[in-house]
Amino acid sequence: EPMYRFRIVAVLTIICAVILYGMPGLSRSQPERGDRAIVIDAGHGGSDLGVRIADKTYEKDLNLRLALALQKELATSGYRRVLLTRSADKDVSVKERSELIRKTNPALVISLHANAGFSGKARGYELYFPGFKTGKEDRNDPAAIIGDMTKNKHLNDSVRVAQHIQKQLAEIFPKENRGLREAPLPLLEGINVPAVIIEIGFITNKENRKKLDDEKSRQGIAQAIARGIREGI
């Protein structure tokens, strides 16, 4: 039938476009690095302290300091559009963070957090990528097919960037890699963009906390994450 043939042609056209877009030689030449937005999400903030310990070390503060350092490193690397979901110690709702991401449609979202354990022994870093649910739309609908293919591409991009960051952080946290796994990211609900969540050390561990709280060490962490991003996108 004419309509069936039209759908087949449309689907094949979409598949070719996605394949060409995903080829390294084409996708990385345009747009230029400086034109690609990156959003850095400093977890918690304001009245939301995040993890806290007895000496009044708050996760929200460590997240923000690292986010600012990472923004600076990426700007130095040629990324002109590096946006923060918060640039100060203030309350920013998940809805507000999501709206920024939705409007920006960035090449990548990096969400920064610090971990905590029941004792001071747990240490190291772990990374997560969001799982993108495929739709239940008509499988003959070209729009539904391209939607799922885009989600799969974003998933692959997320995992690739996470693996590069993971490798770079190994130099800062030797033998403290706690793995890479899938986890939901509420601020990406209904938004499909590449994203990586980084739990960057345990603030309940003295050595990890010192690295996060020390300016020089924090700069080294930011540089490692920036290198991973450059290699991954």
Regions found by a protein language model. Give the residues of each.
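Bacterial N-terminal signal peptides that target proteins for export
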Residues: P2-L12
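Bacterial N-terminal signal peptides
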Residues: A10-Y21
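Catalytic-core regions of hydrolytic enzymes
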Residues: L26-N140, G147-V161
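Conserved hydrophobic/aromatic pocket- or pore-lining residues that grip, position, or stack substrates
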Residues: I40, N63, I165, I198, ...
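Generic non-transmembrane alpha-helical segments
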Residues: A69, E73, S77, R160, ...
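Active-site-adjacent mobile loop/cap segments within catalytic or ligand-binding domains
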Residues: T104, S111, N115-S119, A170-I233
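Short, well-ordered alpha-helical segments in soluble proteins
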Residues: T150-K153, L169-F173
